[in-house]
């Protein structure tokens, strides 16, 4: 697993994001519930976070993820990339995704 302490800072457009193996998730009316089996913590994602999580069913780069999200959300590209990097960095810190 990548260094999760600095995961947000280490992300580049070519960083590949993969869902961690030690977790399970389910859709709850458009939101996402996730449990990390490693630490026993449950997490909840709002509809935007749930959309990102579902896109990560297959490993994607930050660039690919942002391209998919840009088709749905009317937001400035630089803002989108920044927000995605922060979000993915937090998921990595919680052990929910791996970054390569």
Task: Outline where the language-model segments fall.
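Hydrophobic packing positions characteristic
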Residues: 1-23
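Long, charge-rich, low-complexity alpha-helical segments
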Residues: 2, 28, 41-100
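Short boundary/linker motifs that mark transitions into or out of structured domains
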Residues: 16-36
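Detector for Asparagine
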Residues: 6, 36-39
